[in-house]
Amino acid sequence: MTLFTRRNLVTGAALAAPLIANPSLVSAQVSEALVGSASDAERIAMDAYIYGYSLITTEVTRVQMSNVPALGGLHGPMGQFINVKRYPPADYRGVSAPNADTLYSAAWLDLGAEPTVFSHPDMGDRYFLFPMYSLWMPVVECPGARTTGGRAASFLITGPGWSGQVPSGMREIKSPTRYLLILGRTYANGTDADFAAVNALQEQYKLVPLSSFGKPFTFHAPPVDPNPGFSMTDKPQSVILSMSAEDYFNRLARLMGTAAPPAPEDGPMLARMARIGIAPGQPFEAAKLDLTVREALRDLPQRALAVIGAGRSSLGNEVNGWTVTKGLGRYGINYMKRGVVAAFGWPANLEEDAVYPNTTVDSEGRVLNGANKYTLTFAAGQTPPSTASGPSPCTRSTKAGGLYPIASTSSQSACAMT
């Protein structure tokens, strides 16, 4: 039997809970003689890569968006809203499959030192939502017209382990990770007058540290890290592909041990990963793996992305040639679906707020071509619902996930309804 590591970690359900509650216990459970096949280790490495893909993607995106000294374009310091004043242009790639009916308001929060109070004004009957994403990418909460209504409100957003007094009249939103993304959307009908009205609302979206709530507060941007360790301009997927498997797993282990504790239901996966030396807060040492396994790790990023790409069918069901998404925003232990969304649709709304039926072929199975004209047909009385104060039910996107330009002659395109 081939040695795949010189360390033996107690595995199974008995290890899972201690790993989550106190990752430092891993080092206390190391002995010297676990053996197993190299193929076992390679499968674990593949599963671990997919498991961590949403976390690494979100962390890379966080740094690229927020490691800046001031607001500019689609970037802004931690703790400050980036308010987009008009519909996104056709070349916008900040999120996958954006819509052209709402104006975006995005902010990254650091909840490590203290909670943040998020406030919005009275929104009337205007459609809006503020989905909040953990570093692992699931939606933590989604204040908005559908869930909390249009009245002015304040929310206390707290990080892992916080315990304290929640101010009267506030609802606590508990983030499972130190960093959290708010990706707000506010409906606008496209006229200059309505853009101005929404822009005025955006100026009233406030983020204040709990210690400063109700007091005069002046925002100060946190210091910029001059060496984030990867490109600030390449697409996250390209950044991740450029990482070696050892670098990737070390980043994953560091994040799990600090900013992004694994979920309780991740226990069995943590126990498997520990068998090849991947554990929260512990260094991953590829040199301690068998040579065959180390060789397999060399092209793991490319192979794993191919596996994730092949897993797109996990996003939903096929109906009349369309893949109709199901269960986005809540992933549980479906790490493949979470990885697919991270790679090709980051970060995705809850299905109560958006469904993403998509196709790249016409009714006869031919690949969509931007040079052609197509008709999208709904049965009588079965068009997607919409209201005067809410967004259009249908947005077209290119295959790459951007908005579909009206004059596009792209050789391939995709349709999506959001």
Placement of each model-derived feature along the sequence:
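N-terminal secretory signal peptides and thylakoid transit peptides that target proteins
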Residues: M1-A16
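Hydrophobic core
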Residues: P18-I20
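A compositional/structural signature for long, glycine/proline-rich flexible linkers
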Residues: Q29-T418
